[in-house]
Each structure stands twice: as structure tokens, then as C-alpha cells.
Amino acid sequence: MSGGSSCSQTPSRAIPTTRRVVLADGVQLPPGDYSTTPGGTLFSTTPGGTRIIYDRKFLMECRNSPVTKTPPRDLPTIPGVTSPTGDEPPTEARQNHLRSSPEDKPAGGEESQFEMDI
């Protein structure tokens, strides 16, 4: 049962930096610049600590990809969001619905909360 295991660990190394940006004390970065570099590279960290780096050139190439120009296959139809707003009911019909909604009625003490047949 006792067998020799040949498990070896690789020493961890830091990600090499190619460019350092020195900021003076008191210099505030705008919120949009927190995860970017002066060269346009975007970087992020997952909750597990994995570092993700997106090169600007790669992102610009993805923008022109045919995949970005087609919607997902099983996308639901939501008027005004995933389909043009031409499917909406006329404005007059929507206003009539809003006028007759029970929420707009004034709450009086003599009206019961609901009706019940006994």
C-alpha cells in the first residue's frame, strides 16, 4: 500500500509586467480607468482570484466578428428590448388601461376589501 508518489510542485511566479505607470500621490483615476492600462488593455480578477487580461487588439477584432452581429438562438421576444417597438398597443389603449386600474381608485372607509357571495 505504501508506494512512492512522484508528485512535484512547480514554484509560483508573478505575472511579468511589461509597462509600469507611476502615479503621483493624490492623483485620482476616473472610475472607467480602474481596470485599464494606457495601452488599452483591459484586465479583471474573478472572485476566485484568477486574473483575466484582454488585449485591445483582440477585443477590436471580436467587435467585427459575425458572431456579434447575430442574436442568440433561443432569445425570447420582448417588445422594445429584443424586437422593434412596432408590436406595442396604441397609446390610447394603454391610457384607458391605466385610468381603470384599481390602484388609482381612492381608498375609502366604506368600501370593502373584496366581495364575497354568501
Curated annotation (Swiss-Prot):
Protein name listed in UniProt: Eukaryotic translation initiation factor 4E-binding protein 1
Keyword annotations of the record: Acetylation, Cytoplasm, Isopeptide bond, Nucleus, Phosphoprotein, Protein synthesis inhibitor, Translation regulation, Ubl conjugation
Organism: Bos taurus (Bovine)
Highest taxon of source: Eukaryota
Self-association state and partner proteins as the record states: Hypophosphorylated EIF4EBP1 competes with EIF4G1/EIF4G3 to interact with EIF4E; insulin stimulated MAP-kinase (MAPK1 and MAPK3) or mTORC1 phosphorylation of EIF4EBP1 causes dissociation of the complex allowing EIF4G1/EIF4G3 to bind and consequent initiation of translation. Interacts (via TOS motif) with RPTOR; promoting phosphorylation by mTORC1.
Location within or outside the cell: Cytoplasm; Nucleus
Domain notes: The TOS motif mediates interaction with RPTOR, leading to promote phosphorylation by mTORC1 complex.
Pfam families: eIF_4EBP
UniProt modified residues of type N-acetylserine: 2
Family stated for the protein in its record: Belongs to the eIF4E-binding protein family.
Sites of Phosphotyrosine modification: 54
Composition bias type Polar residues, residue spans: 34-48
One GO MF term: translation repressor activity
